[in-house]
Amino acid sequence: MGCAFCHNPDTWEKGEQTITVAEVLQEMEEYRNFYESSGGGLTVSGGEPLMQPEFLAELLATAKQRDFHTAIDTCGLASKEAIMQVLPYVDRVLFSLKGSTEVSYQVLTKAKLSVVRENLLLIGRRKPVTLRYVLIPGYTAGKESLAELIRLVHSLSGDIEVEVLPYHTMGITKWEALGRDYPLKNVPEPTKEEITDFRNSLRQAGINLAATEN
């Protein structure tokens, strides 16, 4: 997406490496004991994994045949066809929500929230979702953003939890090393009090927080 707060801008340059489903599963089998003892499994992230729906569907389907728990980490910017092709083989979706208002989302990602919202509704009514929300002062941490986030979560009828991810500035040096201007250079990290208040507001609204938040 090229998010304004990305801490890995060094990964934006295009490159490629071909790997097969069999190769991925072979590597997973080597760690099966670890997955079984820890309750872990296969989580496919990116980039955006839904940009390769055919491969992703085959990979997840094969993993489930071998009794691995499956998950994808997506920003939700994908076609409905791609999503529906993959969902049957997913146990949980980690959904990265970059903002809860049209303005903040557009500023931070240069993409439209409306598309992401529709896809979140599509997914959230079919699969368990961990909604990962980045808390950025001045962009996603205000009262309007909080109210919109609560409204959005309440519109989902399925199993959903929210993980609040405090914005950090650890990626600034990477932007500078690449000769790029960091868009949020003057934005401070949220204080512990701001983080706690935001999480408590979600709890008071009846929203479940991810285990890491409790």
Q: What do these predicted ranges mean?
A:
Residues 1-19:
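Canonical Radical SAM [4Fe-4S] cluster-binding loop centered on the CxxxCxxC motif
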Residues 106, 183-196:
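A short acidic, glycine-rich active-site loop
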Residues 6, 176-184:
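Short glycine/proline- and charge-enriched loop/turn segments
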Residues 25, 29-177:
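Conserved AdoMet/S-adenosylmethionine-binding subsite of the radical SAM
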Residues 16, 141, 190:
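Catalytic cores of large soluble enzymes that bind and process phosphate-bearing ligands
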Residues 193-214:
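A cross-taxonomic marker for long C-terminal extensions/tails that follow the last structured domain
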